[in-house]
């Protein structure tokens, strides 16, 4: 392809992604766009075509971003190349969204005609505006009985400042308005600006591992050209590789001769190590490198930590491999080895939030066949000790003794909730109960209120979202972002079984709630831990002080069953022998702890 052809081609490229709150019909709209541009044979068409993971289909959510190239013949007679980058909508996957947006010039903003704008919609809009993207607003599901497209159009104007005339009314399910959206993409989304003659700059926005071909990186070319045979250099690490294949996704992988300015495609360069192709890095040519790397998107730091332990200790190394492979296209997943007296060897793993944690666990169990026990999640606490040193604690078992600590700081988040009017009281009460501090409240219209609170992250990560949904009959939407660490009066609660501390059940709690939580947890454990041959005391302790206790009764084994009638002294002898046996067992006995018991720490608030 000569210089002029590359410039002409660039003018007809449109790169866009679809952003929306969960369940506003994003994946269905992506399906319709694929269908209407004849990108997929009718026989291959299926719902949620871009959601390739089984888990995504089952839960009906998008977890991984996906990029696909489409051809569209517009009414002006030109043929355009569209690159559609599908993104997730859940608050835990914001970083996936920010990655996709870094590769685009425009975004289709999908809003449900019945639900209207939700917290996550706003969060994604601000992300798109930070990336200077053009927005194409679409009100979807207009054929629903509860749809109120006019109210939603008004809302878009009032809350985001979008002109009502620019809004497209559509129903992805019934194929209404799709043609208009495709034409709007041509008009509204700008062509990429970049110089095909300049040194190569390509942004890696995703990567996956193929056991045969090595790392396959999804890239967006900002400047320059790349083709098979080129020697490329990663700007973050300085490592060099030879390109063996470049290609595009249609959604299947299709090798092409070259990728040039504005193209979104994939590159394979015999990269064997996951760390050498980090998402957010810039690729350039080894012999003619670019001066400085592209602005990657912001690195997301894990917020929630938990221990993952294989049920069978032989799987320890397999678990490490599984985590490394998942980490390849999940830059925010972090892990380090950890050992626990109760659970053996495993990994302390960091996640963005609870959904992220569940999904990683489920993927390890499904894709790698490793059965796991997960400990209760915790957040990072900063402790200033009396000797002036500072320690970060992400595992309650490692918390220093209280008498050595001068101050403890915990992370606080700004939680934004959009709630129907009738439930404001219930939501405020929930936030108060979770140690929240009221910041402000805006009425969007007669029906909905935007409430902002500052809440400790440790209260949010457990089951805040579930409780928010049940307190508002499912109508609330929720988004949160980290603000700062603040000092709190926190204590470490230890759980003792049969007098021994179980490190995996320790948790950190605010002193005001310590007694209730300790009491609730020992009662809960009493029902979850199977009865043993001997009585097991379950205690909750802060330091040396026991704050709650209960006993798990022993199973009675009838040692007299073989004793028919007969001598009382014989029976007494058998009972004495049983008693001595139980005492010995109690001294050396191990208490079996089921997985549910480790998760009981989470569910204490439900009682």
Swiss-Prot record:
GO CC annotations, alphabetized: plasma membrane
Catalytic activity: GTP + H2O = GDP + phosphate + H(+)
Lineage, top ranks: Bacteria, Bacillati, Bacillota, Bacilli, Bacillales
GO biological process, one term: positive regulation of translation
Job description of the protein: Required for accurate and efficient protein synthesis under certain stress conditions. May act as a fidelity factor of the translation reaction, by catalyzing a one-codon backward translocation of tRNAs on improperly translocated ribosomes. Back-translocation proceeds from a post-translocation (POST) complex to a pre-translocation (PRE) complex, thus giving elongation factor G a second chance to translocate the tRNAs correctly. Binds to ribosomes in a GTP-dependent manner.
Cited NCBIfam families: lepA (TIGR01393), small_GTP (TIGR00231)
Record-annotated tr-type G domain positions: 11-193
GO molecular function (one): translation elongation factor activity
PANTHER family from the UniProt entry: TRANSLATION FACTOR GUF1 HOMOLOG, CHLOROPLASTIC, TRANSLATION FACTOR GUF1-RELATED
Species: Staphylococcus epidermidis (strain ATCC 35984 / DSM 28319 / BCRC 17069 / CCUG 31568 / BM 3577 / RP62A)
Localization, UniProt: Cell membrane
CDD domains: EF4_II, EF4_III, LepA, lepA_C
Primary subcellular site in the record, as a coarse category: membrane
Signal peptide segment: none
Protein family: Belongs to the TRAFAC class translation factor GTPase superfamily. Classic translation factor GTPase family. LepA subfamily.
Designated name of the protein: Elongation factor 4
Pfam families to which the protein is assigned, alphabetical: EFG_C, EFG_III, GTP_EFTU, GTP_EFTU_D2, LepA_C
Keyword vocabulary terms for this entry: Cell membrane, GTP-binding, Hydrolase, Membrane, Nucleotide-binding, Protein biosynthesis
EC number: 3.6.5.n1
Entry binding sites for GTP: 23-28, 140-143
Membrane-topology annotation of the record: Peripheral membrane protein
